[in-house]
Design a protein with these regions (language model features):
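N-terminal secretory signal peptides that target proteins for export/translocation
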Residues: 1-18
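Charged interaction patches that mediate protein-protein contacts
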Residues: 2, 25-28, 89
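Intrinsic disorder/low-complexity segments in short proteins, especially the signal peptide
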Residues: 7, 33-36
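Bacterial N-terminal signal peptides
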Residues: 21-33
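Transmembrane beta-barrel domains of Gram-negative outer membranes and organellar outer membranes
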Residues: 37-252
């Protein structure tokens, strides 16, 4: 989770705070999003891991009214039981007075029950997000988090539902937050998948996102596009995203 610091919602919704609102969405994406078969363009994670003995790369660009972010999240599963993700993103703003900001993500994920066709699975992930531009120096403030993804398969995998619940410790604000996400993927054809989800925490209004994923080379290379926004928020909280995902069968 996701792809993707969490700020006080009152500050996030305050006009003239583009960096805070933007980075809140970035972190939420990083928190909920770690690659798997559901993966891009989902923020809500699933109960799957990257292919055993291999790595994958997800990269995407997200466009807001006054900023653009670019992300790259490589993930590897060398043993088949533990997946590691190490990546980051950069945000650039239309306002020339605002410098670009960067985030870095480190996460580990495992499964307690793998997801089977017409069955269910669940697991756990733990990680941290760092914000060097906001918290400079050798002792960077960041966020430590844990979440539990649950996935359920229906109709021979034509429909798969995902549910996430988690906890976040905001080091910079010394605050705890409960996180959540719910999403669905509908496999319209063997190449085309429709996705929809909602996600957020216990202190702010929810976000939603919907879009499509298309496998140019099934099980190897896909592209996707989404539109999303925060419920009840202004157009500044609306985004469009385009992404790619590369999933080779074996690297080790």
């Amino acid at each position: 989770m996701l792809i993707s610091r969490w700020y006080d919602p009152a500050n996030l919704m305050r006009a003239g705070s583009p960096i805070r609102s933007f980075l809140w969405v970035i972190f939420l994406s990083a928190l909920i999003h770690v690659p798997a078969e559901a993966a891009r363009p989902f923020v809500t994670d699933d109960a799957r891991l990257t292919t055993a003995g291999s790595c994958q790369l997800e990269s995407w660009t997200r466009f807001y009214a006054d900023s653009t972010e670019v992300w790259a999240l490589p993930a590897c599963n060398p043993t088949g039981h533990l997946e590691f993700t190490l990546g980051g993103g950069q945000a650039r703003y239309q306002d020339a007075s605002l410098s670009a900001s960067e985030d870095y993500v480190l996460q580990a994920k495992t499964l307690f029950r793998p997801l089977d066709t017409n069955g269910w699975g669940w697991g756990a992930a733990v990680g941290t997000v760092r914000h060097p531009q906001i918290n400079p120096g050798p002792n960077l403030h960041g966020n430590t988090y844990i979440y539990f993804p649950l996935s359920v398969s229906f109709a021979d995998d034509r429909v798969v539902m995902h549910l996430n619940t988690g906890w976040l410790h905001d080091k910079s604000l010394s605050r705890e937050r409960l996180t959540w996400g719910i999403g669905s993927e509908i496999n319209a054809t063997h190449r085309l998948t429709l996705v929809a989800e909602s996600f957020g925490d216990d202190l702010a209004s929810a976000y939603w996102q919907t879009g499509v994923r298309y496998a140019i080379i099934p099980h190897l290379f896909q592209v996707d596009a989404t539109v999303g926004r925060q419920t009840g928020a202004s157009d500044a909280y609306r985004w469009f995203s385009f992404g790619v995902r590369f999933t080779p069968a074996s690297l080790f």
